[in-house]
């Protein structure tokens, strides 16, 4: 690892060093540059480059593992909301590293799993697109009803169809989470940030990003469909349906609703 942090090339792993990006899992292996091309960027990440005799894929999986992530998160210093990883702490970590053959064997197994996850994600995305198309056709474009709202329907407000559970949210700092067993997912605004040994919710819920990264590039809200036992910090709205509206229906509704016009804030979007 080196702290200059603004240059990278194919094979390097880049890890966010500022909160909440690191907790949100912002780490990637670079593979989009041309041969010999060098990338430049922000100083808000750390670049990891495999030394000779080490496997770049193994380095990536090592950096994304708790072995590196957890000490990095615990080392964060700075004002609230702008805390950064201390690169010297990361550089000083002692880790067990197998020989090159062992590294390649480990990385190969993990890559196969990643490829399967990516394939499943594509299937899910395709199914979601089909569901969105059906929902839009019936409830937005009203095609089955010749474009007219049926007489027994009415225009209402979101409050008529959702229950908000935000009052039950309890944020846990990275230091508080560091010593907890990794059992239940701990959600942030956009993704699983960590795992903890306790939970606040049990069931099927819709999480809608409240601040930070709240919309995608087209202005649609960042949503997470979650099921089971989990914990949520205070950066996501926690939603269930009422009056006959399921969480699945709400997901489709919000995923097709552009909210850019109601997003506020210059630096911290909300």
State the predicted function of each range:
Residues 4-65, 78, 188-190, 198-270:
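A short beta-sheet element
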Residues 96, 100-171, 176-188:
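Non-catalytic DNA-recognition/assembly elements of restriction-modification systems
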Residues 74-76, 172-179, 265-269:
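Short coil/turn segments at secondary-structure boundaries
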Residues 81-82:
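Extended, charge-rich, solvent-exposed interface segments
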């Amino acid at each position: 690892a080196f702290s200059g942090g603004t240059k990278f090339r194919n094979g390097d792993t880049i890890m966010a060093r500022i909160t909440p990006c690191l907790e949100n899992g912002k780490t990637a292996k670079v593979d989009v540059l041309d041969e010999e091309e060098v990338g430049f960027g922000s100083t808000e990440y750390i670049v990891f480059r495999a030394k000779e005799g080490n496997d770049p894929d193994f380095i990536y999986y090592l950096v994304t593992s708790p072995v590196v992530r957890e000490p990095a998160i615990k080392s964060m210093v700075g004002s609230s909301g702008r805390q950064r990883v201390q690169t010297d702490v990361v550089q000083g970590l002692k880790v067990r590293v197998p020989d090159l053959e062992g590294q390649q064997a480990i990385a190969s197994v993990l890559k196969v799993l990643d490829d399967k996850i990516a394939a499943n994600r594509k299937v899910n995305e395709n199914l979601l697109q089909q569901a969105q198309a059906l929902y839009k056709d019936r409830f937005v474009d009203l095609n089955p009803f010749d474009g007219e709202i049926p007489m027994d329907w009415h225009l209402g407000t979101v409050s008529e169809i959702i229950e908000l559970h935000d009052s039950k949210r309890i944020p846990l700092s990275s230091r508080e989470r560091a010593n907890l067993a990794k059992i239940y997912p701990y959600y942030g605004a956009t993704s699983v940030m960590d795992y903890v040994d306790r939970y606040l919710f049990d069931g099927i819920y819709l999480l809608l990003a409240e601040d930070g990264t709240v919309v995608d590039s087209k202005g649609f809200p960042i949503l997470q469909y979650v099921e089971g036992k989990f914990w949520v910090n205070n950066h996501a709205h926690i939603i269930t349906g009422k009056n006959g509206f399921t969480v699945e229906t709400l997901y489709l509704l919000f995923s097709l609703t552009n909210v850019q016009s109601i997003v506020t804030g210059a630096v911290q979007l909300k």
